[in-house]
């Protein structure tokens, strides 16, 4: 028989840098999960990613206080900022442009995000990422 699910916990944790401090500690402590066990497992699983890259994770906590977790791809905004080499997006994206990004870079980001995005084809996903880029104040070049 399947284990009874007690809770789902959604967090964004820096890849390879999970530790018991907030936000991880309080969120998992409330559910009675062994925090250090999660931190070790998460850091081992995100070893291949760039250290410090914010990584969304969904933790399923069971009634017997055991857990499983699924890591997702980093948010599109983070990948766009990294590709464009900027610190933050524009406060006024229609007026102040903060950087440029090429269509090839958008396609690479769409391919990275493909597993987590809903879309029929890579072109639709690229257009979605392009919209995010524009809303951040990035100029898309062909």
UniProtKB/Swiss-Prot annotation:
Keyword RNA-binding: yes
SMART domains in the cross-refs: RL11 (SM00649)
Modification after translation, per record: One or more lysine residues are methylated.
This protein's GO CC annotations: cytosolic large ribosomal subunit
Stored InterPro entries: Ribosomal_uL11, Ribosomal_uL11_bac-typ, Ribosomal_uL11_C, Ribosomal_uL11_C_sf, Ribosomal_uL11_CS, Ribosomal_uL11_N, Ribosomal_uL11_N_sf
Pfam families reported for this sequence: Ribosomal_L11, Ribosomal_L11_N
This protein's UniProt keywords: Methylation, Ribonucleoprotein, Ribosomal protein, RNA-binding, rRNA-binding
GO biological process terms, semicolon-separated: translation
GO molecular function: large ribosomal subunit rRNA binding; structural constituent of ribosome
Family indicated by similarity: Belongs to the universal ribosomal protein uL11 family.
Entries under NCBIfam families matching the protein: L11_bact
Subunit structure: Part of the ribosomal stalk of the 50S ribosomal subunit. Interacts with L10 and the large rRNA to form the base of the stalk. L10 forms an elongated spine to which L12 dimers bind in a sequential fashion forming a multimeric L10(L12)X complex.
Purpose of the protein: Forms part of the ribosomal stalk which helps the ribosome interact with GTP-bound translation factors.
Protein name in the entry: Large ribosomal subunit protein uL11
Gene assigned in the entry: rplK
